[in-house]
């Protein structure tokens, strides 16, 4: 299979880099890459949001703040490249053609953000579409799609299986401002819908058993085309 992994920045760097988790995740990704072609996109997470918040105090515009966030995503991507060692393409990949070329070289391409207005969720979905991926795996700090934000509403229920169209409806009211944080952003959901990409949305626990996840055995949400 060809698989794209979308890894939230706050998963890797909750307040500071989670060295143990990054090490274990890189091992899982390396093992999966032995039997499958994989590509990775890393988000900016809490660190990017903090930088963007400070930039807002200086009246930076949304495009400037998007560029600032992109730099943080690429710093996080470099951390993962370091952990993946020789299995990774040695520098952060910045466009989809370069990602494709890295795969042909039997290396794992690791990307961050690319363009203002596109979250790394959207980059992941676009990359999966471009590469003709069989599967998109979204790793977040929320272990699936819920009826409401489980961090704010204790009565929110996890949805084990939904359609891509239902995903679009659920996330459709999310903000598109720089640094916005949702389980997946509306643009990414729309790309998943149009591309018919099977998607798993999982949390950190499942991220440490990726062989099970790619076979459909996980505790997150399956998004069917």
UniProtKB/Swiss-Prot annotation:
It is found in: Cytoplasm. InterPro entries: AceGlu_kinase-like_sf, Asp/Glu/Uridylate_kinase, Uridylate_kinase, Uridylate_kinase_arch/spir. Its main location: cytoplasm. Its EC number is 2.7.4.22. Gene3D superfamilies: Acetylglutamate kinase-like. UMP binds at residues 44, 66, 114-120. ATP binds at residues 9-10, 45, 49, 140-141, 146, 149. Keywords: ATP-binding, Cytoplasm, Kinase, Nucleotide-binding, Pyrimidine biosynthesis, Transferase. Inhibited by UTP. One of its GO terms (biological process) is 'de novo' CTP biosynthetic process. Pathway: Pyrimidine metabolism; CTP biosynthesis via de novo pathway; UDP from UMP (UMPK route): step 1/1. The keyword Disulfide bond does not apply. Pfam families: AA_kinase. One of its GO terms (molecular function) is ATP binding. Disulfide bonds: none annotated. Transmembrane segments: none annotated. One of its GO terms (cellular component) is cytoplasm. It is an enzyme of class 2 (transferase). Homohexamer. Catalyzes the reversible phosphorylation of UMP to UDP. This is Uridylate kinase. It comes from Pyrococcus abyssi (strain GE5 / Orsay). The gene is pyrH.
């Amino acid at each position: 299979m060809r698989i794209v992994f979308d890894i939230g920045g706050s998963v890797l760097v909750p307040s500071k880099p989670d060295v143990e988790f990054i090490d274990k995740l890189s091992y899982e990704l390396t093992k999966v890459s032995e039997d499958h072609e994989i590509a990775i996109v890393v988000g900016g997470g809490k660190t990017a949001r903090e930088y963007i918040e400070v930039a807002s105090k200086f009246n930076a515009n949304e495009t400037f703040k998007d560029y600032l966030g992109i730099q943080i995503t690429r710093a996080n991507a470099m951390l993962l490249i370091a952990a993946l060692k020789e299995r990774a393409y040695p520098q952060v990949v910045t466009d989809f053609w370069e990602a494709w070329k890295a795969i042909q070289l039997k290396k794992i391409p690791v990307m961050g953000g690319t363009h203002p207005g596109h979250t790394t969720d959207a980059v992941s979905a676009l990359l999966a579409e471009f590469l003709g991926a069989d599967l998109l795996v979204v790793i977040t700090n929320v272990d699936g799609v819920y009826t409401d934000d489980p961090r704010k509403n204790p009565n929110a229920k996890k949805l084990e299986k939904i359609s891509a169209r239902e995903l679009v409806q659920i996330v459709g009211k999310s903000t598109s401002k720089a640094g916005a944080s949702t389980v997946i952003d509306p643009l990414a959901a729309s790309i998943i819908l149009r591309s018919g990409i099977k998607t798993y949305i999982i949390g950190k626990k499942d991220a440490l058993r990726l062989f099970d996840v790619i076979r459909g055995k996980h505790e997150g949400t399956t998004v069917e085309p």
